[in-house]
């Protein structure tokens, strides 16, 4: 069995680092900071006369998915991933993204490659309905290899104070709606690379596995789905009580961030189609379901928490917007966390 920790990613150490950072960051907070460190997005009250809006910001990167782009020399979609990771996070608080900035650091600046990357960023911004207003490109020889780069971004959005989503209205009996993912998205790639031996043999990315209808590399580079416009459409019609973006830490880490203490999310396995890529990863890694659900999105890229009466309306809108959705579980009273059944 090959776990995420075996691949070099220690999630527990990450949690420890966040807890240490929290206290440092809190020393800088003023009275306009609404959310604690660890929320999907950071909420800041616009404390100006006659304003009832909150700024919501988020920052993230593409992670080691970039290694796949390096090996395949394909750089046109990782920019979409970068935007998705940021705007999907601030969407969890009901915010409409306003603008985006990117940061590219590379070993050797190659203008055409950078332009290709940024074209993907711009495409992501178009999908999300926000503006790419600036960024930074840093050439750092001796720090990165010549053919390698890192890509991160920063998004800012806006939500009316009385419409901000923080999970405060979640109650027992509420329903969890899962929104279909487009594949692995942008998390779990350290484990993926280890499981398939990609770093030792990059040519494996050209292999077409029986479970997939395209090469492994093409499957792994599918861009992260951006949920902004479909979810904002749902918000026009119903109240969404909580939203979770399923990223690093999978179901177990992210779904509990969408509701307060005293509840547990009960997930019914088998209520949606787990994508073939995840079956393939599990086959080769030999890890159990809990490890898979704590590492990957398993075919669900975002989870909405709504009242029973609003489920049908929400799913109809999502279907109209081209997003497959599933009732995947319920909210029950409990000690917190996620239970898989």
Swiss-Prot record:
Q: Tell me the GO molecular function terms.
A: ATP binding; phosphoribosylamine-glycine ligase activity; phosphoribosylformylglycinamidine cyclo-ligase activity
Q: Where in the cell is it found?
A: Cytoplasm
Query: What family classification does the UniProt entry report for this protein?
Result: Belongs to the AIR synthase family.
Q: What is the lineage of its organism?
A: Bacteria, Bacillati, Bacillota, Bacillota incertae sedis, Caldicellulosiruptorales
List keywords of the entry alphabetically.
ATP-binding, Cytoplasm, Ligase, Nucleotide-binding, Purine biosynthesis
Q: What is this protein called?
A: Phosphoribosylformylglycinamidine cyclo-ligase
Principal localization? Answer: cytoplasm
Q: Which GO terms describe its cellular component?
A: cytosol
Q: Which reaction does this enzyme catalyse, per its entry?
A: 2-formamido-N(1)-(5-O-phospho-beta-D-ribosyl)acetamidine + ATP = 5-amino-1-(5-phospho-beta-D-ribosyl)imidazole + ADP + phosphate + H(+)
Q: Determine if Transcription regulation is one of this entry's keywords.
A: no
Q: Which EC number(s) does the record attach to this protein?
A: 6.3.3.1
For biological process, the GO terms are: 'de novo' IMP biosynthetic process; adenine biosynthetic process
List the InterPro entries: PurM-like_C_dom, PurM-like_C_sf, PurM-like_N, PurM-like_N_sf, PurM_cligase
